[in-house]
Amino acid sequence: MEKFFSPSRHNYADLSPTDVPASEESDEALEEKQFEYFQQRQHRRLVLVNRLLAASTVALVMVSLWLGWELHTAKFGSMGSFQYGFKYELEAAKKVIKLEEYKFLGSPIFLDDGTELVPEPTPGPMKTLGVTDMYVGEPSKELDWNWNQLHWGRFFLLTEDEARQAWGPGYKEYWAENEGGYIAGLEVTHSVHCVDMLRKALRRDVYPLDSPLHGPIHTDHCLNHLRQMILCQGDLTPIPSKYYRGITDNYIFGDMPHTCRNWDSVREFITDRFNGSSAVPLAPGTVLSDPYKKLLGILDE
């Protein structure tokens, strides 16, 4: 008879931490190190990204500033431009500059019999700077009034900041005690005044000297100043000539279009600075005599 034996009984106890195999401990440590490495790597990436963003922002700002300066230089140049105002022009006046195309008038023509005359202007689409007979011809009160309107109120006061900007560190030498401030006139009205003085000098029988300050030296000053202004402006508009049978030759024809600054805007600016809302007040305590009141528009002529 076969004998069956039951398996022997064995007692099992729970494993203690010290009984865990070394391979399992090393796996956990490795996972912790990997996690720590991953966190450090992510931190380094974030730092690098932030630095790149900061550097890119700085570079973008620098490029924008550089491009802005290049565009400014291209637009204005180091000395300014005819359209936006030149370096030495009054800053406040630059804001009123507008360019216009004007057709000049007044060139003489010759008839077939040799008669010289200035024809009546024909209406056209282009603006003009006034018809010829408003400013030339036999002296008259109307003629004088037309000229006076061009340079009337040409002197006005500047603020101290404007004087400093216009004339530099030595601006205080231009203080005008009698007028109570820094008195100035724009070049355009100074030049027109000079043309008017030369017009009158040609007819001393009608316009005797009204002041010893307007004698021959002043006349020479005006002539030489206009010479310099014309050369300084250097207008490059080509002026043609036309053939006339009456003189069997060509003669200059100056009635051509020119690019100009809008005169009405400039004239309005001068008037407002002279006695309008933007006029600079006299220095406190200034007592003006009648000639200076007339000069500054406080007393009518």
UniProtKB/Swiss-Prot annotation:
What residue spans carry the region label Disordered?
1-26
Q: What class of enzyme is it?
A: oxidoreductase
Which residue numbers does the motif HXXHC 1 cover?
Answer: 189-194
Give the UniProt record's GO annotations in the biological process aspect: mycotoxin biosynthetic process
Q: What is its main location?
A: membrane
Q: Where is this motif: HXXHC 2?
A: 218-222
The subcellular location is: Membrane
Q: Does the keyword Cytoplasm apply?
A: no
User: According to the lineage, what is the superkingdom?
Assistant: Eukaryota
GO MF annotation, one = oxidoreductase activity
Protein's pathway: Mycotoxin biosynthesis
Tell me what topology the record assigns in the membrane. Answer: Single-pass membrane protein
Give the record's keywords alphabetically: Glycoprotein, Membrane, Oxidoreductase, Transmembrane, Transmembrane helix, Virulence
Q: Where are the transmembrane segments?
A: 47-69
Cystine residue pairs: none
The catalytic activity of this protein is classed by the Enzyme Commission as 1.-.-.-
**Glycan-bearing residues:** N275
* GO cellular component annotations of the record: membrane
Q: What does this protein do?
A: UstYa family oxidase; part of the gene cluster that mediates the biosynthesis of the phomopsins, a group of hexapeptide mycotoxins which infects lupins and causes lupinosis disease in livestock. Within the pathway, phomYd catalyzes the desaturation of the Asp moiety into 2,3-dehydroaspartic acid (dAsp). The pathway starts with the processing of the precursor phomA by several endopeptidases including kexin proteases as well as the cluster-specific S41 family peptidase phomP1 and the oligopeptidase phomG to produce 10 identical copies of the hexapeptide Tyr-Val-Ile-Pro-Ile-Asp.
Give the family, as the similarity comment puts it.
Belongs to the ustYa family.
Provide the domain comment.
The 2 HXXHC motifs are conserved in ustYa family proteins and might form active sites.
What is the protein name stated in its UniProt record?
UstYa family oxidase phomYd
Q: What species was this sequence derived from? A: Diaporthe leptostromiformis
